[in-house]
């Protein structure tokens, strides 16, 4: 594999939040209108649930009512615990039969998978809770891959086994927020240690997050 010239800029979430707050202070009406418009778009575009998941919908409805789950973080914790408890990580998980629904196959038959299956199932469940959610594919980059350049920047060459999938939930005022659902991988942006989750070869070493879509 040859190195590519692609450069991905990294903007820490706290930096983005500071910039948004500064813009809101300067002209809150503009930001509010933009936020309201996109929130409406996200709600119309990213909340559809496929047919045939009645039992899972009932599970989510009961959890929302019984545990009073309304915040995205709490809902994420519930979904993560449910998936990590009832399903097994397997980088060599069997593929669904031709023509089968891959998410339903994961949830009801194989009950094992890697980041693709965990993220896909999580997106469906987030939507069942009423939250706009989407499926994202990118990379999880080990810290060891990064080398500092003379200009102070950090570069890394990412390969196929750094590929990773995760769910993102739209939260008003924050935008699309990553929700990691794969067992053994980063849960929140504040956590320093996580493992890569190749698609679908083998899990790797401690890593730092690198996002793509």
Model-derived regions: residue spans:
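Hydrophobic/aromatic-rich core segments of domains that either
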Residues: 116-206
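Gram-positive cell-envelope targeting signals
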Residues: 79, 207-213
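Active-site-proximal helix/loop capping residues that flank conserved catalytic or ligand/cofactor
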Residues: 18-20, 77, 113, 165, ...
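Secondary-structure capping and boundary motifs in well-ordered enzyme cores
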Residues: 99, 107-114, 118, 159
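Acidic low-complexity segments
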Residues: 1-109
């Amino acid at each position: 594999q040859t190195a590519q010239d692609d450069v991905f800029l990294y903007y820490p979430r706290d930096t983005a939040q500071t910039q948004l707050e500064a813009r809101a202070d300067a002209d809150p009406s503009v930001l509010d209108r933009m936020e309201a418009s996109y929130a409406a778009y996200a709600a119309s575009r990213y909340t559809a649930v496929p047919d045939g998941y009645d039992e899972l919908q009932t599970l989510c409805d009961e959890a929302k009512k019984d545990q009073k789950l309304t915040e995205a973080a709490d809902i994420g914790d519930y979904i993560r615990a449910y998936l990590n408890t009832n399903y097994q990580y397997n980088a060599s998980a069997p593929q669904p039969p031709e023509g089968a629904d891959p998410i339903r196959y994961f949830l009801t038959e194989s009950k094992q998978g890697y980041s693709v299956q965990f993220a896909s199932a999580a997106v469906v469940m987030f939507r069942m809770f009423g939250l706009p959610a989407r499926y994202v594919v990118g990379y999880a980059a080990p810290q060891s891959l990064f080398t500092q350049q003379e200009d102070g920047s950090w570069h890394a060459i990412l390969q196929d086994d750094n590929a990773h999938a995760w769910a993102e939930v739209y939260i008003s005022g924050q935008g699309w927020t990553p929700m990691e659902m794969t067992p053994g991988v980063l849960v929140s942006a504040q956590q320093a240690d996580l493992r890569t989750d190749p698609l679908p070869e083998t899990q790797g070493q401690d890593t730092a997050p690198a996002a793509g879509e």
